[in-house]
Amino acid sequence: MTISRRKFVHGSAVVATALSTPLIMGAGGKKPRVVVVGGGAGGATAAKYLAKDSKGAIDVTLVEPTRKYYTCFYSNLYIGGFRDMDSIGHSYGNLAASYGINVVHDWASGIDRDKKTVRLAGGDTLPYDRLVLSPGIDFVDGAVPGWDLSAQNRMPHAYKAGSQTELLKRQVESMKQGGTYVMVAPPNPYRCPPGPYERVSMVAHVLKQKNPKAKILVFDPKKKFSKMGLFQEGWEKHYPG
């Protein structure tokens, strides 16, 4: 049975793993092999502790196309000017140097469950005894009426931290005086329920300093949201109106 990259990336908010059973030394005394797809918070943490807790008894390979991972958590503090971009960026050198993890910078393009292999976009194939899938989330092109992937450079979502976060910060800081910032909060369920409200709070902080006559409009399909009372109390105190 073969799984394409499209099939597993679109359901990628979860770590799918068969690590609940013990790994047994392979034929010829070879170490058992674990391949982790995705080097974000979930995948990198799984790879680190598999390597660390096994004390080198497991051969761990981490597949991640990017050279640096930017955390979505704390990215709102970057937008608000409380952190710089480097502080939310993490490279993979320490995973290799400190824990002996084999880091492969490539896309995982397919999985063959029967042969227990991961196919890479560059053409190589990685065999595994156990597989962890943690490739993160992304937008499905055309899933939102009137919006597609080509629009993200004009209307950055910044759900995936990095260049989108930097673009959003630049756009907020360069808004015309007295302009309007509009945010549409997603319906439940979605990743990080307080995230949209943290973000709009940081945008309000920036506009209060740089563009005090600007307006903020939030369109929200939910009647209640995470930490609603705390956010409303803070907005009334710091950004009334």
Model regions and ranges:
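Short, well-ordered coil/turn residues at beta-beta hairpins
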Residues: 11, 134-135
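Bacterial Sec-dependent signal peptides at the C-terminal "C-region" and cleavage site
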Residues: 21-29
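Beta1-alpha1 glycine-rich phosphate/pyrophosphate-binding loop at the start
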Residues: 28-102, 187-229
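A conserved short coil-to-beta-strand element within the FAD-binding core of flavoproteins
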Residues: 106-114
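Core beta-strand elements of the Rossmann-like FAD/NAD(P) dinucleotide-binding domain
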Residues: 122-130
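Glycine-rich dinucleotide-binding loop and its adjacent helix/turn
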Residues: 135-210
